Curated annotation (Swiss-Prot):
Domain of life: Archaea
Task of the protein: Catalyzes the methyl esterification of L-isoaspartyl residues in peptides and proteins that result from spontaneous decomposition of normal L-aspartyl and L-asparaginyl residues. It plays a role in the repair and/or degradation of damaged proteins.
Keywords (A to Z) from UniProt: Cytoplasm, Methyltransferase, S-adenosyl-L-methionine, Transferase
Active site: S61
Chief localization: cytoplasm
Listed InterPro entries: PCMT (IPR000682), SAM-dependent_MTases_sf (IPR029063)
GO cellular-component term (any): cytoplasm
Organism per entry: Pyrococcus abyssi (strain GE5 / Orsay)
Similarity field: Belongs to the methyltransferase superfamily. L-isoaspartyl/D-aspartyl protein methyltransferase family.
Name recorded for this polypeptide: Protein-L-isoaspartate O-methyltransferase
EC assignment: 2.1.1.77
SUPFAM superfamilies to which the protein is assigned, alphabetical: S-adenosyl-L-methionine-dependent methyltransferases (SSF53335)
Length: 216
């Protein structure tokens, strides 16, 4: 069985389990399989529903976790989206397929910026802009955002990210301890300016390092 057939079975499994619920997320997963965004030695494991190593001691999230966050985000075509923590570039590619416009993704590790750019180029993704910087501060030049997705765990919700949301926008972020245990929060900025927070349960992410995250 080739890589794509294995990946297709993983997508079908996530759909059966109710993790992938929308056609947009399913189509994005089928368009950009995870094996396109890992090193060659890990490609044959990319269909397994677990995190995988990427350079600089980081990881690419398990498929179910990525799907959960994308479904919570309720992405639609034309939305302005910021991703904090580019990693391999896979999540940014999925986002870009759904919104079909420019996506901004910020990464603090130079090695991963280059890794993600190479992966995105090979995959034919042209609408993702990878920026080297401190993602805990957001990316003010392209704010405000409809959605901000953070792929690393913070000690608390970074204020700059909330400030950079549009009225009606949502921030998806793991918040909790440094050592791989957080709660996945959906922070919604109501049109009135009121902030509502919904807890989607326990998750495990690498730490968000930065001025408004954890210190190195």
């Amino acid at each position: 069985m080739d890589l794509y057939e294995r990946w297709k079975r993983t997508v079908e499994m996530l759909e059966r389990e109710g993790i992938i619920r929308s056609l947009e997320v399913k189509e994005a997963f089928l368009k950009y399989p995870r094996y396109m965004f890992v090193e060659d030695r890990y490609k044959s494991y990319a269909h397994i529903d677990e995190p995988l190593p990427i350079p600089a001691g980081q990881t690419v999230s398990a498929p179910h976790m990525v799907a959960i966050m994308l479904e919570i985000a309720k992405l639609k075509e034309g939305m302005n989206v910021l991703e904090v923590g580019t990693g391999s570039g896979w999540n940014a590619a999925l986002i870009s397929y759904i919104v079909k416009t420019d996506v901004y993704s910020i990464e603090r590790i130079p090695e991963l910026v280059e890794f993600a750019k190479r992966n995105l180029e090979r995959a034919g993704v042209k609408n993702v802009h990878v920026i080297l910087g401190d993602g805990s501060k957001g990316f003010p030049p392209k704010a405000p955002y409809d959605v901000i997705i953070v792929t690393a765990g913070a000690p608390k919700v970074p204020e700059p990210l909330v400030e950079q949301l549009k009225p009606g926008g949502r921030l998806i972020i793991p918040v909790g301890s440094y050592h791989l245990w957080q709660e996945l929060l959906e922070v919604v900025k109501k049109k009135s300016g009121e902030i509502k927070v919904r807890n989607h349960g326990g998750v495990a992410f690498v730490p968000l390092i930065g001025e408004y995250g954890w210190r190195e």
